[in-house]
Design a protein with these regions (language model features):
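N-terminal acidic leader/helix
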Residues: 1-33, 56, 60-62
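Short, charged early-sequence alpha-helical segments and their helix-coil boundaries
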Residues: 36-62
Length: 62
C-alpha cells in the first residue's frame, strides 16, 4: 500500500477501510513529517464525519 493512494481514495470515496487504517498505524514510524501531516488531516476529516470508516473491502479499489 501507499499512503498517498490511501489518502486520495479516502478523499474521492469518502470512506476508508479498517485494513487501510491498520496499515497506516503499522507503518507510521516510517513516515516523513509531510506524511504525518496528511495522516493528521485524515484524522480530522474522520473526526468531522467527512470520511467514514467502513469495514467492507468493497471500498478498497485496486
Amino acid at each position: 500500500m501507499n499512503l498517498g493512494i490511501i489518502i486520495l481514495r479516502a478523499n474521492i470515496l469518502g470512506v476508508i477501510t479498517l485494513k487501510e487504517l491498520d496499515w497506516i498505524t503499522e507503518n507510521e514510524h516510517q513516515f516523513s513529517r509531510l506524511d504525518m501531516s496528511l495522516v493528521i488531516k485524515l484524522g480530522r476529516l474522520i473526526d468531522n464525519g467527512i470520511i467514514k470508516i467502513n469495514c467492507a473491502e468493497k471500498a478498497y479499489i485496486n
